[in-house]
């Protein structure tokens, strides 16, 4: 398992992450298959989109069907018929966000089982045991997760505890065919983030994750933390910003120097009939304006949905038939994968500034319609100040 940097452009890198089941081209977006399956998409469809890696949730798989059963089935790859790479999270985030009764002490995380109601303990060693049974290519350490807006001594305490838990995870990690990423914590405090990055870098072998973001913080804080962490981390390891999935966030973070991302957003937003498009950002297909719009979601998209179905058809079934969610999910995942492909090409060709200008101009422009008179507005929306500041930090200029 190794990471090769193939090209650089400003802060950004384009690389190949060599894993047991596939070579993953970075920057990369990882779709989320919560319990070993994507919402409304089968593995064969992901292969047809050239998806090389996806994320599965240790917390959910540990409860259903259970890691012992997954191991007995031959591991997660075999059970879900997926012969490409998998990354599993540690389960810590879900315990904090989903459990009504949750406490953390030096031993680990104590939480209420969603199935039995009994209190359970998850020490770092148990998290690694479960992930090794699942058999993912990349595992995550158990970290002390706190809300991103938390302030005070607990932020520093959680950061130092995450470092100590990493050391325990390293002792429990016995499989050479599985990589393990540390998770960088420190809240919105840039000095704590830099301190944590220094300690995690001493221990990391394959890659490092930037955790504790995308939880409701202001975007101006978000991008500055990502930029500071990327600058502080070793240049030879991939940097994984956890929980990032909005297209603008993916683009900005990639050009700040991040390499890996994951989020449920593409499939979650599809359930509400929302399609992701380059021009206009989001297309609300449940709106009446699409009732007689016989264009595909995106003329330039090569996904099966855009090749075969119209906006009008999807409008007629979204929210009524499960196939509506399926069709939009297929498009949204392909949209994200294609976006990251274009980001990689921009880095490879050293055309980041040109790409940024075109992407942002399109994204904040009006959605193309079969009948322009039906568009809500022909005016371009304002590019957020945080985006402009991040682009300026990269050394590029927007002329609109």
Swiss-Prot record:
- UniProt GO cellular component terms: cytoplasm
EC number(s) recorded for this UniProt protein: 2.4.2.64
Q: Which residues are recorded as binding Zn(2+)?
A: 301, 303, 306, 331
InterPro entries, per database record: TGT, TGT-like_sf, tRNA_ribo_trans-like
Record keywords: Cytoplasm, Glycosyltransferase, Metal-binding, Transferase, tRNA processing, Zinc
Catalytic activity annotated for this protein?
Answer: guanosine(34) in tRNA + queuine = queuosine(34) in tRNA + guanine
Subcellular locations according to the entry: Cytoplasm
Record bears the keyword Metal-binding: yes
Q: Where's the active site on this chain?
A: 89, 262
For this entry, list what GO says about its biological process: tRNA-guanine transglycosylation
Q: What is its biological role?
A: Catalytic subunit of the queuine tRNA-ribosyltransferase (TGT) that catalyzes the base-exchange of a guanine (G) residue with queuine (Q) at position 34 (anticodon wobble position) in tRNAs with GU(N) anticodons (tRNA-Asp, -Asn, -His and -Tyr), resulting in the hypermodified nucleoside queuosine (7-(((4,5-cis-dihydroxy-2-cyclopenten-1-yl)amino)methyl)-7-deazaguanosine). Catalysis occurs through a double-displacement mechanism. The nucleophile active site attacks the C1' of nucleotide 34 to detach the guanine base from the RNA, forming a covalent enzyme-RNA intermediate.
- How does this chain assemble? Heterodimer of a catalytic subunit and an accessory subunit.
- Name-wise, this protein is Queuine tRNA-ribosyltransferase catalytic subunit
- Organism, by scientific name, is Caenorhabditis elegans
């Amino acid at each position: 398992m190794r990471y090769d940097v193939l090209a650089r452009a400003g802060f950004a890198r384009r690389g190949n992450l060599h894993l047991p089941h596939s070579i993953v081209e970075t920057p990369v977006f990882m779709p989320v298959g919560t319990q070993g399956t994507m919402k409304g998409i089968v593995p064969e469809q992901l292969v047809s989109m050239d998806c090389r890696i996806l994320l599965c949730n240790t917390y959910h798989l540990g409860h259903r069907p259970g890691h012992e059963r997954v191991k007995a089935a031959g591991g997660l790859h075999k059970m879900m018929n997926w012969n490409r790479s998998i990354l599993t999270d540690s389960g810590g985030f879900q315990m904090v966000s989903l459990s009504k009764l949750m406490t953390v002490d030096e031993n680990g995380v104590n939480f209420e089982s969603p199935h039995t109601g009994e209190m359970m303990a998850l020490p770092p060693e148990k998290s690694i045991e479960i992930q090794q049974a699942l058999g993912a290519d990349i595992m995550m350490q158990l970290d002390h997760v706190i809300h991103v807006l938390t302030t005070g001594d607990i932020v520093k305490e959680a950061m130092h505890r995450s470092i100590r838990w990493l050391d325990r995870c390293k002792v429990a990690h016995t499989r050479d065919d599985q990589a393990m990423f540390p998770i960088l914590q420190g809240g919105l405090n840039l000095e704590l983030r830099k301190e944590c990055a220094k300690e995690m870098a001493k221990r990391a072998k394959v890659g490092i994750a930037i955790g504790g973001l995308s939880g409701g913080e202001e975007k101006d804080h978000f991008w500055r933390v990502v930029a500071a962490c990327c600058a502080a981390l070793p240049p030879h390891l991939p940097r994984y910003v956890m929980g990032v999935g909005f297209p603008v966030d993916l683009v900005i973070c990639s050009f700040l120097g991040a390499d890996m991302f994951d989020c449920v957003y593409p499939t979650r937003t599809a359930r509400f009939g929302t399609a992701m498009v380059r021009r206009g950002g989001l297309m609300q297909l449940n709106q009446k304006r699409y009732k007689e719009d016989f264009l595909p979601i995106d003329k330039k998209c090569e996904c099966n949905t855009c090749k075969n179905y119209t906006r009008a058809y999807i409008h007629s079934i979204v929210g009524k038939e499960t196939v509506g969610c399926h069709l939009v999910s297929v498009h949204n995942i392909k949209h994200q994968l294609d976006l990251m492909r274009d980001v990689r090409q921009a880095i490879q060709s050293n055309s980041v500034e040109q790409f940024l200008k075109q992407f942002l101009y399109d994204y904040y422009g009006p959605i193309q319609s079969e009948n322009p008179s039906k568009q809500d507005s022909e005016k371009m929306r304002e590019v957020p100040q945080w985006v402009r500041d991040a682009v300026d930090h990269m050394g590029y200029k927007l002329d609109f």
